[in-house]
Structure formats: structure tokens, C-alpha cells
């Protein structure tokens, strides 16, 4: 029996990288997965990977910067699979600028995708998590099961990162949201935790080519490697496994935790 057998999970930013790895890993462990990404091509590719392995998924291209889109996504997932048990708030982008060059447009964009989407998706999940637990408490005195919310923050919120004032502010906001929701939702047996990846091999950390919006200079990549005790960059699957642990019954007494997945990176 899989560690998430019979559970229904929503994973945002699931078209690539950490989100895709998490959605696939959850499906391998028995969860039905709502695969959310604003890019329909990558989202459908993730669903195809899940389906090829015998798993169940539903693709959603909802742009959860809008609350209504988040509500529609959760409703569709509950209609398709009967419930919502797990939320993985993973959607994120970087748009790097030194602070004196940072404008409102880039500030708002990065805060929207990294933080506002997490607020909307989690808020839209309350009827399926908190309200479901309240009904169980009214009937029996206690919630029937633990339900789970996880976030992807970043080790950059701990260390700071030159050129990423918008990104680190958003990821710091995720930490505050995680710890506050852990307190608010704990009485309903809803565990709320976050994973803080270090340097993970994704398109956001690939060597930046001239004209690219994302990626980082190769010199910075090599400097980052020198700070990692385990001597390698992380892979999306490393982070997916952390989300899986926190979403599983093995973590039923863990809440409000920020779990670094950084290979012993200095400062984490």
C-alpha cells in the first residue's frame, strides 16, 4: 500500500521541476493528483507521466493569482476525486534585479506567483480541509484524519541572495504563513509545514544564457557548489521526497516546521 493511498493532492507549479517531481512521486505512492500549472503543455506532460505509471490525475491550468480560479480548481478536484486531503503550494518564479533597479512590476509579479498563489490556493482549500474536519468533530468529537498543507519556500530566505529582494521577501512570507497556519489549523488536525530547498537543478537555476528571463550565471553556480557540504546540486526528486514525507502519516505529529533540503549548504 502506498504512503498516500486513497488521498487526493493538489500540487501547484506541477508542470516542471520540483512540482512535477512532487506530483509524480505522490502518484507513485497512491495519491490522485490535481496537476496545476498555467502552462498547459508541461502540465499535460506531467499528467501523461502519471498516467503511464497507472496513476490518476486531473490537469488544471488555473491561474491562482486570482482567488476565483483557485476556488474553481479545488472544486474541480473535489468533484473528480471526492475530496481534497493535501495541498502542495509550490508555484514560483524568479525575476532577479539588484535592489536599486527593482521596479513595482517585477516586485508584484514575483510576490504574486510565489506568495499570493499560495494564499489563494490554501484559502480556497479551507472548505475541504478545515470545514471537513469541523463536520467530523461535530459528529465524533475529533477529526477523522490528519490533512496536510506544505509549501515550497527557499533557503534564500535564511541567507539572503543578492539580486533577489523580491524572491526572498516572498519566500519569507511563505515561512510566516506556514507557522501561523500551523497554529490556526492545528486544532483541526491539519499539519502545515514548508520545505526550504537549497540549490536545486531546475530551469530557474540553469546556467543563464544571454536574453533569458530565468537562470543564473555559471560563475554563481560554481560558487554555490562550494557551499554545499554534500558536494552536489540537489535534484527535484530530493525536494519531492521531503514534501512526500510531510504529507504522509509519518509526519502526523510534525507541524510548523521549515525543513531545509540543501545538502548541508552553509547558512541553512
Spell out what each predicted region is.
Residues 197-207, 211:
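Short, flexible catalytic-loop segment of classical short-chain dehydrogenase/reductase
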Residues 154:
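Residue(s) in the substrate-gating loop at a strand-loop-helix junction
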Residues 98-99, 103-111, 224:
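Substrate-binding pocket helix/loop in short-chain dehydrogenase/reductase
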Residues 122, 170, 178:
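Active-site helix of classical SDR
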Residues 40-41, 61-73, 104, 237-238:
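The beta1-alpha1 cofactor-binding region of Rossmann-like NAD(H)/NADP(H)-dependent oxidoreductases
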Residues 159, 242-244, 255-268:
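Short C-terminal tail/terminal secondary-structure segment
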Residues 186, 191, 254-256:
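Short, small/polar-rich loop/turn modules that mediate ligand/substrate recognition or access, typified
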